[in-house]
């Protein structure tokens, strides 16, 4: 394994660990904001189960995406998090939270996220994920470009 690929793997493992650690705070903040906007009170006893369900929904895909070879179309770690909002959505629906209005773009692009809980950036999950997310993305791009150069000149 080339040095840059080993470094990419290390960055991926660091990001996996940090995302896993950040899920609880992200779920809690997201549920509190959506519940408040939706006119319902948070039942804190329900949060632990939803945090764990969200973790179970997100982390296998996060691991797969971040560990994937750069030449394999693997998707996005943020898409994996956006696709894991189901437990939060179900909880907010059960509580009777009003869903915010959404335009056609949001309806079409994120049909499973009626409360707009999914992150657009790593910093939407946790500010501490911003830099590791950028570093991982840059390292992935570097490895991809190096391989392209080598195959073009090899």
Give the location of each predicted region.
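Extended, amphipathic alpha-helical stalk segments that mediate dimerization
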Residues: 1-75, 83-154
């Amino acid at each position: 394994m080339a040095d840059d690929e080993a470094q990419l793997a290390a960055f991926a493992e660091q990001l996996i660990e940090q995302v896993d650690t950040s899920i609880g705070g992200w779920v809690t903040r997201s549920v509190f904001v959506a519940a408040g906007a939706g006119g319902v009170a948070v039942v804190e006893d329900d949060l632990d189960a939803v945090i764990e369900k969200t973790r179970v929904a997100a982390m296998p895909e996060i691991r797969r995406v971040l560990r994937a070879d750069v030449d394999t179309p693997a998707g996005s770690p943020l898409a994996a998090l956006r696709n894991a909002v189901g437990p939060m959505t179900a909880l907010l629906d059960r509580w009777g939270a009003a869903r915010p209005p959404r335009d056609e773009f949001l309806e079409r692009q994120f049909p499973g996220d009626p409360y707009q809980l999914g992150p657009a950036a790593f910093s939407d999950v946790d500010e501490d994920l911003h830099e590791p997310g950028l570093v991982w993305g840059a390292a992935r791009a570097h490895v991809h470009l190096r391989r392209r150069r080598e195959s073009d000149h090899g």
